Structure formats: C-alpha cells, structure tokens
C-alpha cells in the first residue's frame, strides 16, 4: 500500500533536470516545509522544525517542472512516499524516503500564475481554449525555455542546473502538461 501525502513548502534549489541512459527525463528537487505555531504566551508565530523532502518527477512532467519551477517558489506537491535502499561508495547501507510526485505546482496563496498547456514533450504551446476573443496565441517564453533546458541537459551543458527561468514575479507564466496516472513511470 502506498502512502499518498500532500506537502506544501518552498523549493530549496532549482529543479535538477537530468536524463537516464535510456533518454528518459528525470527531475529531482527538495521541498522544505516548515510548520508555524502560534505561541499564546508571547503572542507571536514561531517556526517549528523544518521537513526537507526529496521529490522526483519523470519524463515530460519533469521537463515542464524544470521549465516552470525555481528555487524559493512555494509549491504544493502530491505524491507517494517511497523508501529507497542504497549502498554508499564506502559500502555502508542507507535508507532514504522520497516523494514520487504525482502532481506539483506553485501555490497561489502569495502569488498569481498564468498557465498555458504545453504540447507533447513540453515543446510549443497549443491553442488556449480560455483565450480572449482576439484568440491570443503564440509562443510562451517558458515553453521556449523548456526546449533550451532540454537541449542543454542532453548535451551535458549545465545539466539543466541553474538553467531555469528564475522569475518568481506576480503574473509569471507557468507551463505544464496534464499527466495521466497511467503514464506515471514507477
């Protein structure tokens, strides 16, 4: 049985876009979630102990997340907790808990976002069904950036790290693609 959880927190770094030997895109990221509690004696809000949770995304979803998310962004992520056992170079056995992310996006509590549907493999923008009557359509800067990140990572240039559009301004576009649960590669 999988444990499905929802985590709200801030990204500690830009998502790391890489490719497996078979060519599948994969993104790793860490979400820091800090509980806040109200202290009635002092009349102030106090931070609790932060939780740092490592998350992973695959394929087109990984490419879209790398193009849309950046360090410091407040996100909400839903996924399954998975335990991973591994051995260090020194031969020590270790265990880690990771979040296999099913859904992730920026929270709208302190920001706004304009979303546009990405076409196959995160390239280009399909027509916006919610566009105004002028039929505004065009190339989304984040989608174009997604293509650059993908090419750089495939060529080993920056491996996608620090290659992201780091704007976290009100009204920024966020590109994403619907990801059916049958397509989740785990």
Curated annotation (Swiss-Prot):
Residues 175-186 have a biased composition (Acidic residues). GO terms for biological process: DNA replication. Residues 1-108 form the SSB domain. Pfam families: SSB. SUPFAM superfamilies: Nucleic acid-binding proteins (SSF50249). GO terms for molecular function: single-stranded DNA binding. Residues 119-186 are annotated as: Disordered. Keywords: DNA-binding. Homotetramer. NCBIfam families: PRK07772.1, ssb. This is Single-stranded DNA-binding protein 1. It comes from Tropheryma whipplei (strain Twist). The gene is ssb1.
């Amino acid at each position: 049985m999988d444990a499905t959880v929802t985590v709200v927190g801030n990204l500690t770094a830009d998502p790391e876009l890489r490719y497996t030997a078979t060519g599948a895109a994969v993104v790793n990221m860490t979400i820091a979630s800090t509980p806040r509690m109200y202290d009635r004696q002092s009349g102030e809000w106090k931070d609790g102990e932060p939780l740092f949770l490592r998350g992973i995304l695959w394929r087109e979803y990984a490419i879209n997340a790398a193009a849309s998310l950046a360090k410091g962004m407040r996100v909400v992520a839903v996924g399954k907790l998975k335990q991973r056992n591994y051995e260090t170079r020194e031969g020590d056995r270790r265990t880690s808990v990771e979040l296999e992310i099913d859904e992730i996006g920026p929270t709208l509590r302190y920001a706004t976002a304009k979303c546009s549907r990405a076409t196959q493999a995160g390239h280009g923008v399909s027509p916006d069904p919610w566009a105004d009557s002028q039929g505004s359509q065009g190339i989304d800067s984040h989608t174009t950036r997604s293509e650059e990140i993908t090419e750089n990572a495939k060529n080993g240039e920056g491996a996608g790290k620090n290659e992201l559009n780091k704007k976290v301004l009100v009204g920024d576009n966020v590109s994403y693609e619907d990801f059916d649960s049958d397509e989740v590669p785990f």
